[in-house]
């Protein structure tokens, strides 16, 4: 049996059985490597060699956690909570409470979508924005699974559909790799071809709102490094300045210089808080350490996920899976489209990145689509949807690790059952259905 299928399924089954995701990824990597013929020594080497693949993101998260913890000293989180409580009003005022829920969901959705294009910081906003809002979610009895679905939608749908920010990178990769495989398509056609698959994600978002709209109670707990702090207009102003400086540095480094900006952005924000006197010298060390600990688990998962991905790549069974599936299709367009989408789902679930999936699948899928008689627009829809499938729902993807990092800050949100399973159901299933429809109608 294919090593990728075995590794991914084993990792998913163990995760669903509530085995720690780090352990599940390691066991899945070992099983995949041994099944793929690498041998124990080569498997372990491939795993350890790959650990550094997500090192930058892991360190970025640690720094952002430190920045988020330091922001608590300005009193900004408490000011946000007080303002929201005033907005909510009396607990018996159910209409006002419902409107507050809608407003918060819309704000989080807009911020998440903008993080992919308008202010392309990707997941960097989550550790700063979400932990302070947990008290508000508790006050409103909001189901955090809904928030996870909203954030994940914002992290994925915009880059699939819109040719700006991360979407420009995704669609540029799609065009270039399709051209390398023998099919030249205009860049301007790609968003139109992906409208139907993304419409499926919109349907999934609406369904998640319907399913998770009911109240759910959580215990209000103190977050490490987030004890209540008195605040003034000056301290709130400094907090806003620190956030603006942090975002400014990130955008300058990533957009102007073309380098990763999260680490230096978080550092710049910390410097503003330190120089302003909001963060005292005698408490800075413990505060920053507490913030880093807050994000440590997500960092470890990202590191191990990179090792897992490297093992699957080294087996050569990723390409083998694509070629084997092509042999089952025959001349059936409907079966071909469905199998290509499912193969894309399996690969992205294992690799944890839709961007990394594109080069793997285009080399086989483009000639196969041409052989089956699919139009260029249908081919774009199949490959785009196949690559995007699994980004939502994969335990190793930053599109799920990001939401979990913020929502689990008080230990009451499970990565697999509260983020991965809901996002898998509400986004991957509609994406398969609507991607399949797009392939047949375009």
Swiss-Prot record:
Which keywords fit this entry according to its UniProt record? Cell membrane, Membrane, Transmembrane, Transmembrane helix, Transport
Q: Where are the transmembrane segments?
A: 21-41, 51-71, 103-123, 146-166, 190-210, 236-256, 259-279, 292-312, 335-355, 364-384, 421-441
Q: State the organism's lineage.
A: Bacteria, Bacillati, Bacillota, Bacilli, Bacillales
Q: What is this protein called?
A: Putative amino acid transporter YuiF
Q: Which residues form the signal peptide?
A: none
Organism superkingdom? Bacteria
Q: Where in the cell is it found?
A: Cell membrane
Please tell me where this protein is predominantly located.
membrane
Output the PANTHER family linked to this UniProt entry.
AMINO ACID TRANSPORTER YUIF-RELATED
Q: Which organism is it from?
A: Bacillus subtilis (strain 168)
Q: How does it sit in the membrane?
A: Multi-pass membrane protein
* A GO CC term assigned to this protein in UniProt: plasma membrane
């Amino acid at each position: 049996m294919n090593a990728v299928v075995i590794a991914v399924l084993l990792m998913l089954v163990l995760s669903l059985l509530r085995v720690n995701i780090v352990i599940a990824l390691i066991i899945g990597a070992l099983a995949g490597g041994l099944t793929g013929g690498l041998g124990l020594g080569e498997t372990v080497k491939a795993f350890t060699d790959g650990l550094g693949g997500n090192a930058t993101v892991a360190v970025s998260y640690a720094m952002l956690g430190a920045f988020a913890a330091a922001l608590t000293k300005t009193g900004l989180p408490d000011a946000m909570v007080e303002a929201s409580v005033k907005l909510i009003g009396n607990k018996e005022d159910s209409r006002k409470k419902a409107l507050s829920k809608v407003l918060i969901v819309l704000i989080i959705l807009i911020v998440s979508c903008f993080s992919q294009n308008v202010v392309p910081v990707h997941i960097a906003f989550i550790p700063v924005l979400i932990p302070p809002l947990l008290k508000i979610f508790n006050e409103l009895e909001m189901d955090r699974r809904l928030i996870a679905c909203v954030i994940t939608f914002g992290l994925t749908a915009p880059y699939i559909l819109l040719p700006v920010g991360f979407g420009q990178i995704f669609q540029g990769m799609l065009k270039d790799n399709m051209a390398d495989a023998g099919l030249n398509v205009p860049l301007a056609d790609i968003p139109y071809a992906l409208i139907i698959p993304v419409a499926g994600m919109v349907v999934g978002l609406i369904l998640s709102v319907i399913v998770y709209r009911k109240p759910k109670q959580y215990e209000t707990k103190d977050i490490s490094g987030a004890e209540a702090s008195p605040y003034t207009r000056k301290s709130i102003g400094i907090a806003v300045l620190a956030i603006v400086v942090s975002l400014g540095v990130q955008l300058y480094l990533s957009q102007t210089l073309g380098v990763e900006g999260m680490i230096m952005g978080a550092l710049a924000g910390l410097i503003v808080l330190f120089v302003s006197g909001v963060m005292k010298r005698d408490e800075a060390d413990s505060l920053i350490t507490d913030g880093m600990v807050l994000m440590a688990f997500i960092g470890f998962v990202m590191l191990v996920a990179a090792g897992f991905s490297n093992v699957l790549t080294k087996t050569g069974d990723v390409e083998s899976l694509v070629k084997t599936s092509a042999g089952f299709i025959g001349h059936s367009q409907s079966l071909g489209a469905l199998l290509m989408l499912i193969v894309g789902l399996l690969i992205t679930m294992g690799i944890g990145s839709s961007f990394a999936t594109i080069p793997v699948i285009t080399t086989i899928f483009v000639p196969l689509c041409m052989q089956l008689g699919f139009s260029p627009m249908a081919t774009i829809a199949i490959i785009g949807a196949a690559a995007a499938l699994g980004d939502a729902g994969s335990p190793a993807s930053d599109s799920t690790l990001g939401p979990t990092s913020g929502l689990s800050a008080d230990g009451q949100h499970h990565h697999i059952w509260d983020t991965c399973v809901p996002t898998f159901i509400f986004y991957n299933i509609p994406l398969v259905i609507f991607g399949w429809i797009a392939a047949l109608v375009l």
